[in-house]
Amino acid sequence: LRLICDLIVSNNDEVVMIGPVWPNIRSSILLKKGSIKEISLELKNGEWVIDFDLLLNSVTAKTKMVFVNSPGNPTGWVMPKEQQKLLLNHTRHLGCWLISDEVYHQITFNDFVSPSFLELSKPNDRLIVINSASKSFNMTGWRIGWITHPEELGSHIAKLVQITTTGVPEFLQNGLGSALENHKTITYELRKNLKKSRDIMFNKLVNWNQVECSIPDAAFYAFFKVKGINDSLDFAKKLILETNVGVAPGVAFGASGEGHLRICFAAKDTFIIEIMDRLEPALNK
């Protein structure tokens, strides 16, 4: 993501993005002095939804780049294929870049994979799709990812890689090679375990008085509104002192995340049960 922002974004370039979103993308845009126009997801009837007409109308001739993270961190929201098609057609017509972060593409609970813009793309589209081994293969921290991009960008990306990461160490390449050879087994087991952990967590959350939430169809986060709080960072600090459980404050994911908390459920069942038992007195008053 940082490489792409270095390549595309410059002073005052307008970037349209959907929030709440992983904070590093916002930081990468601001480091290049880009201007962010954020369209916020809304929680309606237990589902995260976007005002899609508002999104399309926000992407104009002034827009340099549109950023989509689907499935999304922190919400688990997935952009439907029909919306992907309409958005891609819109950016194609305007000639702006569409960046799709699809690192949770295989972490889904109702389908084998989530919809990808690559299924709709044409060779000359100004489309860049980002993926990673971190989520699908439990290789977080190995910093192995890949970019699907138009041929014209190849030499420019290579130059940026040369002065940043240079290359992937051989033993990490071997690990990824093994993961790719066994990807069906690995991702099947991962999804099965994550779904079990998700269900344990949300069987509690949906019944807590102070919590309003959506059960995610993808990724591995619970992102929920806590009724009555307007400073999620302060509340998260208090939770650590009261329960010894660390959660991510929603404001870290942008202004639209304020009043929410995020918990990762990529953990063993016994661990999930323990943290929910600790959190219940604070969130189910």
PLM regions with names:
Residues 1-285:
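PLP-dependent class I/II
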